């Protein structure tokens, strides 16, 4: 699958990430990582403010933000997302399952039955201290219990998420770096 382990080390791929237990029966798992020349507390606000109608997703705005440009600075008014809050993603919303600033931010979607969901998706952002600043490790996990769910994961969700998340990580790196033109 394209970009399934983009930027991730073998240790990052094989280690656990906060939120792995939320979608423990995942049939698709992807780990993507990037090193950012900024401290975790300077990177985390960029992640916390994400969402449709908020800062956007820092990816291909024409696709995941209906053409509205993603934020190029940190907005204080979008820094109040806490565990249990909704994070809009267009017609549906994620739940901020885990928010532990400035280390962890985990988004989750569960639908079609809370006990045994037909669709379960998590996206974890783990900010690890690094000699160069921050190592941002992401982990996407999904399980789709619908007809052709595994085909959808393999040929659409996996590659699509890989392309979009790669762009997101590069954009966060660009904005959060102290040498970027993004404003703090």
Where do the PLM segments sit?
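Hydrophobic ligand-binding cavity/cleft-lining segments
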Residues: 1-77, 175-184
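Beta-strand/loop substructures that line and gate deep hydrophobic ligand-binding cavities in soluble
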Residues: 13, 112-167, 172-174, 183
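Short Gly/Pro-enriched turn/cap motifs at secondary-structure boundaries
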Residues: 23-25, 84-87, 115-117
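Short, surface-exposed coil-to-beta transition loops
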Residues: 29-31, 90-92, 118-124
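A short, structured loop/turn motif at beta-sheet edges
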Residues: 37-41, 97-103, 126-135, 174-181
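Short, hydrophobic/aromatic-rich segments at coil-to-beta transitions
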Residues: 77-80, 99-108
């Amino acid at each position: 699958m394209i970009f399934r382990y983009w930027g991730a080390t073998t240790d990052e791929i094989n280690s656990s990430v906060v939120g792995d237990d939320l979608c423990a029966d995942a049939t698709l798992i992807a780990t993507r990582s990037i090193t950012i020349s900024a401290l975790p507390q300077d990177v985390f606000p960029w992640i916390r403010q994400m969402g449709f109608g908020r800062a956007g997703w820092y990816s291909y705005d024409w696709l995941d933000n209906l053409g509205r440009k993603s934020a190029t600075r940190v907005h204080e008014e979008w820094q109040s997302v806490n565990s249990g809050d909704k994070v809009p993603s267009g017609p549906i919303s994620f739940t901020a399952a885990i928010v532990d600033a400035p280390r962890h931010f985990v988004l989750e979607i569960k639908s079609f039955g809370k006990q045994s969901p037909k669709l379960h998706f998590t996206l974890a952002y783990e900010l690890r201290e690094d000699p160069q600043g921050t190592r941002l490790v992401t982990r996407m996990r999904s399980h789709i219990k619908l007809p052709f769910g595994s085909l959808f994961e393999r040929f659409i969700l996996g590659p699509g998420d890989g392309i979009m998340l790669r762009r997101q990580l590069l954009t966060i790196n660009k904005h959060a770096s102290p040498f970027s033109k993004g404003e703090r």
